[in-house]
Amino acid sequence: MRRHHPILILLLILTGVLSGSTAEAQILRSKRAVARERQEQRMREQTKSPYERFFTTDTTSMRSAQGPFLSLHLKEKQLYMELPSESFGEEMLIAATVSDISNPQLGLPGFKNSGPIPIRFIQKDSVVVMEVVNNDLLYNPTDKSALVKNIRKSYTNVSLHKFPITGLSSDGKSVLFDVTDFFLNEQRFFDALVSEVGSYRLSSSPRPDLSSFTTVKSFETNATVGVERTSYVTLTNSRGKGLEDYPTTYSVTYSLLRLPAVPMTPRLSDTRVNFFLTEKDILRSDNHQIETVNFIRRWRLEPVDMEALKRGELTEVKKPIIYYVDDNFPERWRAGIKAGVLRWNKAFERIGLKDVVQVRDFPKDDPEFDPDNLKYSCIRYVPVGIENAMGPSWYDPRTGEIINASVMVYSNVIKTLNNWRFVQTAQLDPAVRSKVLSDSLLTESLEYVIAHEVGHTLGLMHNMAASAAYSVDSLRSPSFTHKYGTTPSIMDYARWNYVTQREDEGVSLDPPFLGAFDYYAIEWGYKVFPDLEDNFLAESKVLQEFVSRHEGDPIYRYGVQQVESRLDPSAIEEDLSDDPIRAGELGMRNLMYITEHLDEWITDDPGAEHRGELYEQILAQAYGYYHNIFMMVPGIILRQTSESSGIPRHQVLPKERQREAALWLIEHAEDFRKLGLEELVGHIPYASLRPFDLVQQDLLKMTMLNTGKLAISYYFDPDSYSPMEYLEDVYSHIFGPTLRGASHLSETEIALQDAFVRYLNASLQYGLQNVYPVGLKSDALSLSYKADKTVCNHAGEENGLLGFGNGNGFPEHLWAQTVNMTSDYTLSYALKVRDLLKRTIPRTRDANLRAHYRLLLGRLDKSLDK
């Protein structure tokens, strides 16, 4: 057995002990180092600025969108904006657009319920403030006089929202602030939901716990924030609640856009041309008076080669208007969409500008392209069951410069086109007698719709007077229609040629490529004047002379779309020709023929749903013809004209035409029911509801609702058709059979008498409150109540007043009470009808007819004996 030396054993023991002590020492030193490092880390954190801590702490889930305009950071469900210091005080636009919604009746995708608002960010103490910029006043910025300073005090900005500052960058070049509350919660300036649904008023209760941010994007000159919200919606009207606490989820996209550093030279408006406007107050340097003027909305089109333009040669523009077409459009739509955009180049070429309007597909190889980027104007496909399209735009409120424009095309617009083509042209065109339009017809129809919407994005409003420039005979002429189409402007609501009859061979049924008025409007709005050096006052004088040269030609007449006050029969929607009566009669003849052949032409429709839709459109079209004739009473033609032209600004139709229209409605109201073919009622579900009976009831009421309107026209022209003459005609026609001692009345004759007595009673009981003409409110009638107001509006015409006219040319207001004596007129006829009934009842043998007369008499007694 081997023996171990005691000293060796001792050494081994000592080594082990020493070794363990070293390890413990190392651990101790390590712990001290960690503690020291943590202490140093805490000290470093304490020395970091709040800005630095934001970007270094809890950043795992942070999403950022960075750009030269501004940056957005989404962190822990909070949204922060980082704005360059140099951008404070810069003017921007902000707006909110509905992106999607659970119920499209409560908000339209792609729609802004309020226009873009000019804003700027400023720093006040320890917060950032968003101000609504008041740029209504235009003045010479070099004028430092006390007068200007005092005037500017009436045009101050509005503080809209304040944001807490999170931090400042170390170099002082940017400010970080919390914008969560502003974007996540409902803002009264940016309502996403509509305010009304039919007769119901909408109110909503937001659910903040269900709101969240969805997207943040930042680009060179703009940025977007996407938000999803949920609200409980309640619909209320005078009869109660239609909905209560109805849950609705919707997405909103907020967009911010930097305005151009150098404003565009504006162009003053002219009420004789159809441009959208932005209103300004100008402080005139010559007399220090403030004058309200309007600038038109238009794109900044600067020629590349000004010398070529001066020589009368075509030149391109520095920045063309490019529309990008959504990839989501069905392939068979795309050709028509692109052709509709490019139509407008023909108008720009007339003023020397080439390839102004361009169209491209959404780019595949451009990583910066984004349809939400306001740098790009897009034609968007909206897959929602809405039969519509629209062309909204963003513009600089300082000058009217259009910066971005989009065309929103809803998927069911195809349904509208199919129905229009069938109902308006099937009497002559076999190609439209099908459930689905052919590719060629679809392309042609879409091209027209898109061209109209692109016209809006170019700044053009509707011109509802255009179609009244052509006669019925012209619309039935092959040579005329192939050259001029159905209207001088595609910005009118004049569709296809419903006047043309089956015997009119070779007639064109289509609207024009572009009308004469469209070329004229583009020339007025976009013509470049190289020698006037961007002097908008000098340009305005030249342009006024240009318009005056065309003033007497109906082809170049602009008729504003009538909203509240509807007095002018020559400026209405969905009409053709200068003769509504003749056009309506021809249109009704065509609709009758189409209705008779509906089953024969549409055979692949086992459930009759499509025929039901077409039949509904037929009735709507027919009602439109009646309404166009109804507008001839009072028949006040409104024109925006210069005094030097000698053309009256308002002119009442001849008395004979007014009376003809009034009597036509009474005599032909019964004809509407002829569209209610019993063979259709038997197998088309919609027709089985007998809607034509309901429409006819409305038409019967329409025949006697002209007293108040005639009071207006009679006020302007004492030689025109008077309210008393009208009531006498209505009375003589409606009670004519009774006056002649008829022993039997038709259903229509009974309904007319019943409607007339109801009208008389309503007038006696409620006066002007409930008895105003259809489409006219008693407190919103038309034209100036002061004889000198019109003179003042144009008194400075020869002295170079800023622009021509006032705004868009909407008629001034006239309080109905000043001229409307409906109650006075109807009292005498209520007494007259009562006397007739008292004489007639004793000698009426038919029990049913006698009961009818007694009912009318009882109603009149109740009103007259109060």
Listing of model-derived features with the role each one plays in the protein:
Residues 1-6:
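Positively charged n-region of N-terminal signal peptides that target proteins for export
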Residues 9-19:
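Bacterial N-terminal signal peptides
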Residues 20-25:
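Boundary at the C-terminal end of the N-terminal hydrophobic targeting segment
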Residues 27-329, 347, 351, 356, ...:
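Auxiliary tRNA-acceptor-end handling modules of aminoacyl-tRNA synthetases
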Residues 46, 361-382, 444-501:
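The catalytic-center signature of Zn2+-dependent metalloproteases
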Residues 342-353, 455-456, 460, 496, ...:
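Sec-exported extracytoplasmic/periplasmic mature domains
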Residues 395, 401-409, 447-458, 500-510, ...:
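Extended catalytic-interface subdomain
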Residues 467-866:
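Conserved catalytic/binding loops enriched for acidic/polar residues
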